[in-house]
């Protein structure tokens, strides 16, 4: 029973990290950048109430299909030229961040988990 609770806690933490950490930029691969707010163009509620992100966010099972094809997100750029601009960042207006080279071990991933850029922090 205890091990089951531990597994459930780990799963909850993993899913929370998946939904909460945005601004993902994989340095030009698949042109992916969700700018921290997961398509705010279509769901403006994210800009003021980020807690609703997990509710409206597209189902995780489709992520490997959506991301390579519709990788650009909301307001801003996907990865660019192998370096990866972070797009327009927070809510489409503020921090951009820059993908830099390699991966960021201190930010939580999206699906591909390389070249992450969490709006300029911990690059």
From Swiss-Prot:
Q: Which GO terms describe its cellular component?
A: extracellular region
Q: Which UniProt keywords apply?
A: Secreted, Signal
Q: Which residues form the signal peptide?
A: 1-16
**Chief location of this protein?**
secreted
Q: Which domain of life is it from?
A: Eukaryota
Would the keyword RNA-binding be found if you checked this record's keyword annotation?
A: no
Localization, UniProt: Secreted
Which tissues does the record link to its expression?
Prismatic layer of shell (at protein level). Expressed primarily in the mantle with highest level in the mantle edge and lower level in the mantle pallium.
Q: What is this protein's function?
A: May be involved in calcification of the prismatic layer of the shell.
Q: By what name is this protein known?
A: Prismalin-14
